[in-house]
UniProtKB/Swiss-Prot annotation:
Keywords: GTP-binding, Hydrolase, Metal-binding, Nucleotide-binding, One-carbon metabolism, Zinc. The keyword Oxidoreductase does not apply. Belongs to the GTP cyclohydrolase I family. InterPro entries: GTP-CH-I_C/QueF (IPR043133), GTP-CH-I_N (IPR043134), GTP_CycHdrlase_I (IPR001474), GTP_CycHdrlase_I_CS (IPR018234), GTP_CycHdrlase_I_dom (IPR020602). It catalyses: GTP + H2O = 7,8-dihydroneopterin 3'-triphosphate + formate + H(+). It comes from the Bacteria. GO terms for biological process: one-carbon metabolic process; tetrahydrobiopterin biosynthetic process; tetrahydrofolate biosynthetic process. Its EC number is 3.5.4.16. Pfam families: GTP_cyclohydroI. This is GTP cyclohydrolase 1. Homomer. GO terms for cellular component: cytoplasm. The keyword GTP-binding applies.
Amino acid sequence: MENFFNQFFENIGEDKNREGLKETPKRVQELWKFLYKGYKEDPKVALKSAYFQGVCDEMIVAQNIEFYSTCEHHLLPFLGNISLGYIPKEKIVGISAIAKLIEIYSRRLQIQERLTTQIAETFDEIIEPRGVIVVCEAKHLCMSMQGVQKQNAIIKTSVLKGLFKKDPKTRAEFMQLLKS
């Protein structure tokens, strides 16, 4: 890692021995271990260990769960929030498990579209609800800091499964709950 940073500093015209940079390779290495720890965790295990048999058959919504991730194209952060709604069949999941699922997938190099899909598909596979919807809203620093340099753009993605995909009334109820 140190060789990588020495080359990087040289390529941008920086002095690797400058006081503020001497420990940077070590600091960044520790930071990257933290930022990308999602590769070492199994999202399915996180969900499997946190559900229980339930009697609820109405919609459950976890709204505005904050996340940050790293764009795989430019290695710059994107951050925002994710809302997940589901209608249980037999299993109800602990709310913190939803946040853990989001954290595991977001702590990897990502694109927002895949992040949204992975969360929805894993939740659908493990919890087997009658329907699940995931809505992700994010601000991408790769769009703000370079290229088109649009600082206020927000990208929204969604994935719908089961009743949320088949029934417009179910979708509308979820959207109404997000607004209230």
